[in-house]
Amino acid sequence: MKLSKYIDHTLLKPQATEKDILKLIEEAKTYDFASVCVNPSWVKLAYENLKDTDVKVCTVVGFPLGATSTASKVYETKVAIEDGADEIDMVISVGQLKSGNDEYVKEEIKKIVEASKNKLVKVIIETCLLTEEEKVKACTLSKEAGADYVKTSTGFSTGGAKPEDIKLMRETVGKNMGVKASGGIHTREEMEVMIENGATRIGASCGVELVK
């Protein structure tokens, strides 16, 4: 697979304007990235501009804290799919996970998978807030719930992707589930290290620099 197809070209800053999003979209077309990842209010715009290409539209749900209710996340997912999203990056309920409420976490992911209507679902586990044991549990629950990917980070918390976390996540989910590294990846060397450790997708706001 060519390097560009690993990349979700990402712009999730709250101050991003329509002009910024359109620039992101044009870059994704030019460099043939896997997707653009935008906030939900920009999904329609991205869909309209990408529907005749093979660049997917990715959006976020329960972002960035993961602390909204399951019902809210399910509704967000349904609206995003209606608006044209191909991929959903949902944030796990970190507090519920850390409280040992495994069934809550698993059922929530399962409901979002169902609401996504066979679109790709990636579960952001926010590795920087978890112990090693919690990282393993988050990955296991995501896999059991039918998600397609586990993802390291929102990029809005206390840390981003680390190679050792990618390695642990890959070992936990096995070879048939996707692993997405995101947060703090700024160079091609960093991206290649993530891929070597098992990442099958890279989330980055500097996608153009990564493939130049």
Curated annotation (Swiss-Prot):
GO molecular function terms noted in the UniProt entry: deoxyribose-phosphate aldolase activity
Keyword Cytoplasm: yes
Enzyme class, spelled out: lyase
GO cellular component, one term: cytoplasm
Top-level taxon in the UniProt lineage: Bacteria
Cited Gene3D superfamilies: Aldolase class I (3.20.20.70)
Residues the record marks as active site: 89, 151, 180
Name assigned to this protein: Deoxyribose-phosphate aldolase
Protein source organism: Clostridium botulinum (strain Kyoto / Type A2)
Encoding gene (name): deoC
